[in-house]
Amino acid sequence: MNSGQLKKIAVVGLGYVGLPLAVAFGKQVETIGFDLDQRKLENYRGGIDPSGEVNREEFLAAAQLEFTSDPGRLAEAEAIIVAVPTPIDEARRPDLAPLTGASRTVGANLSPGAIVVFESTVYPGCTEEICIPILEQQSGLTWLGGLDAEAESGKPGFYVGYSPERINPGDKVNRLETIVKVVAGDTPQTLDRVACLYERVVDAGVH
């Protein structure tokens, strides 16, 4: 794995979690903001966030952020952050359809060596049991975090990180920049790279 600083990232899902994240990263690094909702993207390109989470000045400051609905653009990213919702159904069970759909889209457009970071709120084991097999199936690549260092060398694959979102919609005090970010990675190197990435936008630091 290249241990250098990530030069281009993507954020998948531009709701109340993904949009502030994409805008924050867009001030620091080349960022692709991906969503399938064309009306939402048109608003964002015009500097308008109907939810009020991001203001026009913040959009303008994110000079390196580009919005798109083209999944093929995800192949350009060295790290892809999945920030789609995981709503609860009437039986209070998590609806994983947005997450599995996003995993399929990411997997089909995943470049070797990339890191996929899940921000979506999920139950323990969900990432490894559900998301990673989808990524492997769709990409034809191997999850390298599940292999030892010797087997990892020279094998085309991808890595996985996790950083649970902690944003409270509408809260103007406790924002992305001011809340300590918890991060995890499937290898020590993945953890280091994910931590360094979030440190660029989270003033409160990472843990």
Predicted segment positions?
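Conserved N-terminal Rossmann-fold NAD(P) cofactor-binding segment
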Residues: 3-8, 30, 36-79, 85-93, ...
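Glycine-rich Rossmann-fold phosphate-binding loop(s) that bind the pyrophosphate
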Residues: 14
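N-terminal Rossmann-fold NAD(P) dinucleotide-binding loop
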Residues: 18-19
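Aromatic pocket-lining residues of Rossmann-like dinucleotide-binding sites
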Residues: 25
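Glycine-rich, N-terminal phosphate-binding loop of Rossmann-like dinucleotide-binding domains
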Residues: 82-85, 120, 186
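Rossmann-like NAD(P)(H) cofactor-binding subdomain of soluble oxidoreductases
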Residues: 88-166
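Internal alpha-helical scaffold of NAD(P)-dependent oxidoreductase catalytic cores
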Residues: 134-163, 167-207
